[in-house]
Amino acid sequence: VGKLQERRRFLGAAVGGLLVPALPACGGGDDAPPTPTPPEPVPATQITQAIAQLDKLAADLMASSRVPGMAVAVVRGSQTVYAKGFGRRLVTDAAPVDADTVFQLASVSKSLGATVVARQVGRGGIGWETPVRTQLPWFALADADVSAAVTIGDLYAHRSGLPDHAGDRLEDMGYDRQQVLTRLRFVPLHPFRAVYAYTNFGMTAAAEAVAAAAGIDWATLSEQALYQPLGMTRTSSRYADFAARDNRAAGHVRVSGNWVPGTARMPDAQSPAGGVSASVNDMAKWLAMLLGKGEFAGQRVVDAAALAPALSPQMQSNPPSSGRPAGYYGYGFNVGTTELGLTSLNHSGAFALGSATSFMAVPELDLAIVTLTNAQPIGVPETLSAQFFDLVQYGAIRRDWAKLYGDALAPLLEPEGRLVGQPRPANPLPARALSAYTGLYRNDYYGPLQIADQGGTLVMTLGGAPLVVPLSHWDGDVFTFTLDNENAMPGTISQAAFSSDRVWLEYYDHEGLGIFVR
């Protein structure tokens, strides 16, 4: 469990954690950030030279990582000064990636969504401090006071008290957005506004409140509020739009060292947090708006005062360690400073089923980069951002970023379960008659679980899809099952331990919610 949470936490703030030490928080009761040391000036020619090296940097990363495809764009001032594709959309097809190839953004969607919210805040009628329940009367968390008080900003800063990635495993089981959100009331909470815990569905609830206030669904709101005004014609918050595009990048996973097409990732349930797809040409328009403090091509798209809180430290996301300052999160953005004292805005995105993305913007330099790949997260987009901004600031790459990110991610992509790597018992105790285990089991959070004897094999059926999984006997009343999905790495093994009228499913026991009662 801890390994998975660490993997997700790293991916949620990957660039912020290693590349850019962040400013102290001004939320959660901490002191306001001190004024940073005035940054050293960066020569304009040094930026130009860094851009000129991107072709080689990208080609070298493609060669060393062997990721099938990648697209990169750089915005300087209000202009896209670099936009290029590398490699293939699909490893088994020669069709090339270009700057218009559409990729799934994964958690970079959070930053785009935050600018949709900022646009609505600027239009009035809703604010970052608006309680979610004013727009979603049905919304509830485990504590009545928190349910009434939690705001759009709290959920966008990951400080609601919901635990790390609450709701994600419900999505893997086939539950839709509404079904996941209504079940969050069963999840035990951390102290309100005191603990940072990265969630997709907490943020999705906040976005749903904003959409409700606008009277339209989130995907349509995003289109009308952001994508259309910016001319992002190849961007959508609907999976069906991504799937229908001819020039799209397929996800890939690594099997025995080789990249192969992954299972399609359909993230509509958490669309505000992970469901956007876009090209780097479109992302460059969004980055130009970001650098322009809400202005694009001479037009005001997002109110600057409404956008500013999203781009300011709101919650400490990582404690200081190994000589690095703490990391901080705004509303949908990692907010930090580079070693030269320049403010940075960034986010990473990752689908274990085959997508890794990242952007970094430094407003004081009027400069931003975005990198999209169609492969499992191994640190490629973050490495390119780090290399590029090393060249921008210092004229040289100062660390082996590929090794830093690769080493940080490698152990975190391993399977989970106490029995992983364990030999089967040499002399296991026999199971009881299978009829002793069959029946309908109940769990408020995960819903009903059916255990049936199918030709001498126990099979469990659960979730909204539903998920149908055979059980294998391990020892006595303990059986096992395997999973391979967005949150369960290949090789994951879970125990299913029966006792009297209940069964404990190890994989689903996050926050102690893994007991199903018959």
Where are these regions (language model features)?
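Bacterial Sec-dependent N-terminal signal peptides
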Residues: V20-V42
